């Protein structure tokens, strides 16, 4: 019985992880839950899974939870705020922490879990993108396992099992192409929020679905793959694979190519991250190659997806620039979802922030450097959006 904690328990990753726990109660026990603001759903999860410790960032939701669980025959530890989430992450009884918090908000809780000796099922890619220079040395120092729980990096990790050190030559990340893969570039100026959050294959949260539509999600995954698997950026490629059946591939030194296939279901990589190195039997629908039909691939359109190249450039620059890229993207997507900027303004604002930060880059950033870069980039994007609202071109900002 593995004891686990779930950060972001009311989001897409968290609820799918709890689906796994519900299906395999003899394999997993929930010790801790944390979320940002969905007190009603969190209360339901407390009733069902009976965790020892719980945190919600939004303190105003605490009474909702207390009222909902007042009749229970036990009392979990209830915490609030970001500090509460950190306490849940490091809570003593848990063996593995699923990091399902969206964005850079997951960085500090993940660091706390690593320092407490917890293995990490990493579904929060921003932790490595922004904090890789800090997180990876901590993983080595504390001897914990960092296991990818997103589909692409789980696929790479699975393909690498049994590959000797030095055997990896190239990584090929597959991308669905997102909501607008079949739209002409000229139509992107008319994109609405409702258009952008309709993913053709995957069921995900709003922010990551927009990232998929811009292909920033794949660009961020390139940076994550660099940190996880140690390849340089010119050895990490992206291909559009509309069917989302092949989740990623690796090329070995002899040019052999290995791939991991499966239906687009996030439970598969989550289960593997929690059960590795074991394989747990499931009754989920097996892949039927005849039903799946043809597999197609094409090169991404760099003009249509400028965010992808911004991510490659930030990764190659290194230092705190990936943290700037990530924060600028988070803020720009948030503004788009609030209908304060247009879809095509997302990459413009990200590029603006990255360009402005060039002379402030630090080659070996500390945690404080990363957090400051994150704060700075968000402010720059907000200022840039305000200039856009006034009718000014952001290129003219000083």
Curated annotation (Swiss-Prot):
Q: In which pathway does it act?
A: Isoprenoid biosynthesis; isopentenyl diphosphate biosynthesis via DXP pathway; isopentenyl diphosphate from 1-deoxy-D-xylulose 5-phosphate: step 1/6
What InterPro entries is this protein classified in?
Answer: DXP_reductoisomerase (IPR003821), DXP_reductoisomerase_C (IPR013644), DXP_reductoisomerase_N (IPR013512), DXPR_C (IPR026877), DXPR_C_sf (IPR036169), NAD(P)-bd_dom_sf (IPR036291)
Q: Which cofactor does it need?
A: Mg(2+); Mn(2+)
Reaction catalysed? 2-C-methyl-D-erythritol 4-phosphate + NADP(+) = 1-deoxy-D-xylulose 5-phosphate + NADPH + H(+)
Mind telling me which residue stretches traverse the membrane in this protein? none
List ligand-binding residues for NADPH: 10-13, 38, 124, 126, 205
Q: Name one GO molecular function term.
A: 1-deoxy-D-xylulose-5-phosphate reductoisomerase activity
Going by the UniProt record, its keywords in alphabetical order are:
Isoprene biosynthesis, Manganese, Metal-binding, NADP, Oxidoreductase
Q: Does the keyword 4Fe-4S apply?
A: no
Chain sites annotated for binding 1-deoxy-D-xylulose 5-phosphate: 125, 151-152, 176, 199, 212, 217-218, 221
Q: Which GO terms describe its biological process?
A: isopentenyl diphosphate biosynthetic process, methylerythritol 4-phosphate pathway involved in terpenoid biosynthetic process
- Chain's role: Catalyzes the NADPH-dependent rearrangement and reduction of 1-deoxy-D-xylulose-5-phosphate (DXP) to 2-C-methyl-D-erythritol 4-phosphate (MEP).
By sequence similarity, the record places it as follows: Belongs to the DXR family.
What protein is this chain from?
A: 1-deoxy-D-xylulose 5-phosphate reductoisomerase
Gene field = dxr
